[in-house]
Amino acid sequence: MSLRLVNLGLPKSGTTTLGHALKLAGLRVADYRIRPHQTGGRDAREGAFVADLLYRGLYGSGDPLAHLDGFDALSETSRLRGRSVWPQTDFALIEALRARHPGLRFVATRRDAFAMAQSMLRWSDMVARLTRMPVPGLPAGYGETAAQRMRWIEGHYAFLAAVFGDDPRYLELDVAATDAPLRLGAHLGIDLPWWGTANANPEST
């Protein structure tokens, strides 16, 4: 099965919930990086970051998905460990995906901007990395306050809305909405047997 869905949402937007729901629906999901159990130890991609594979394809053959065969969905694409790589913010990469794969569906998971900003604060050293590394729309030195992170978050989803317009292949999905699983299932043409909260912050209420 060729890849069917790419999530363009930011970290802490519900990417793990999305990935878990898709896995339980029978899809093979790459979330952030390629895990050993997904390759059987016989694949050079083992341990590779999804972000790096997307750019390897884009700047190799022109197809961002060239090195992601065998997967049905990408639930988180950015990288902020060691390097700062953000495919979901890259117009050229998104346009290459749309042109090369006309049947590909896109989703942008999101939550309330303040909730996302606070979740980033509580998750490991994410805010320290955000402020230290250059991130598209959030230069190094910014992102320490919730207000700055919220401005960046809102700007990202406004960017995606401007890029896709009324393209039916794109769905902005509030993962906390009661109809989220129904909307996502309809978008993909599948039934989702589970929807909930995965990878929750231990401090969250």
Which residues are covered by each model-predicted region?
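N-terminal substrate-binding region of glycoside hydrolase catalytic domains
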Residues: 75-83
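The conserved 3'-phosphoadenosine-5'-phosphosulfate
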Residues: 33-43, 107-121, 158-205
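PAPS-dependent sulfotransferase catalytic core
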Residues: 1-71, 77, 195-196, 205
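PAPS-dependent sulfotransferase catalytic domain
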Residues: 23, 58-65, 84-181, 186, 190
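Amphipathic alpha-helical segments that form well-ordered structural scaffolds
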Residues: 17, 21, 96, 152-163, ...
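Short, well-ordered alpha-helix to beta-strand connector turns
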Residues: 70-71, 101, 167
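Short, flexible loop segments at the rims of nucleotide/cofactor-binding pockets, characterized by
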Residues: 49-57, 82-86, 149
